[in-house]
Amino acid sequence: VVLVAHSMGGLVAAWWWAFLSEGIDVAEIITLGTPYRGAAKALNVLVNGMRIGPYVPQAVTDTVRTWDSVFDLLPHYQVVEGNADSLYPHDLPPAITKTVDGFSDKARKAYRKNRRLHKALENKVAESGRNPLTAYYSQGHATLGHASIDAQTNRLAVAKGNPRSIPQSWEGGDGTVPVFSAIPDVLEDDVPSRRRLRGKHQDLVEEQLVFKHVSEYARDRLPPAARGAQRHGVTAYLQVDLEDVVPSGLETEVKLRVVDEDGSVLDAGNVGGNVGGKRFLANRRDDGWWSAQLPALEEGVHSVMASATEVPGVGRVELQTRVGAAS
């Protein structure tokens, strides 16, 4: 059995292997942007409401708050900074989470279930002597990662970037899931089982590297002498800071930059792209990023193609993603 699972589906696949796969020959479980340690975006949605562009549709928010599966996606790491008594979501004061019925109990239950999963995966690997997990992730796109309690408003502020306790090499993510969350405990020291992609969260299922990876299972098995441990890396990445949903009818800022595998910023000759059939050209900033104004978009989902040219030693780097527009 070969499983390919995106986002939360990877948690389902990992749980199945850890607890329910006895007697089944599992060749590989490939997860794409799976929030093994949760995502701050879920915390923001539950506490501050589901946002569609600048709007917070209350009916949608009320419905989402009734789904236990969203609590499973809460950060299971120390996401809250500046308050020693409230490091995890389930520790947050009732005044912060009062709009969500039973928040603390549900968050604590989800945290314990998550820790149970990680422990079960470690035990399964130790007992079976093998680890079928391969975790694909994307890094560098601006991603919600930490939270703090605003002293003036006494509200929870969820912001982009990892908590200060996380090393800089793990900064960023796929726009939804921080890169360190896409790596389960059991793969922390298994570098060959971690592979980097280019795109944002919703685009990972369309990456050619994943397709090529899965396509290998359609081949006849090669003899051991012909097998090699080849890394599937690339040398440059185009990073994008763009909200998943933007207001329709208004121009929206997008920021882009090119980095290498170590996160060092690379120079480029031109950066720009196309969204909804309309071209845009980015201007160089002083901080390594390029900035552009996306043209006003009609309501709906639009394809975005961004590219950087004249990247030293690489040439052209491209990224394809999507953006929603809503009013």
Predicted ranges, named:
Residues 250-262:
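Beta-strand-rich structural segments
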Residues 244-250:
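Short, solvent-exposed loop/linker segments at the N-terminal edge
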Residues 18-232:
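Helical cap/lid subdomain of alpha/beta-hydrolase-fold lipid enzymes
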Residues 284-293:
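Aromatic sugar-binding surface patches on proteins
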Residues 312-327:
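Edge beta-strands of extracellular beta-sandwich domains
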Residues 4-9:
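Gly/Ala-rich beta-loop-alpha elbow adjacent to hydrolase catalytic centers
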Residues 295-301:
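Surface-exposed, short loops/turns at beta-strand junctions within beta-sandwich domains
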Residues 10-20:
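Short glycine-enriched nucleophile-adjacent loop
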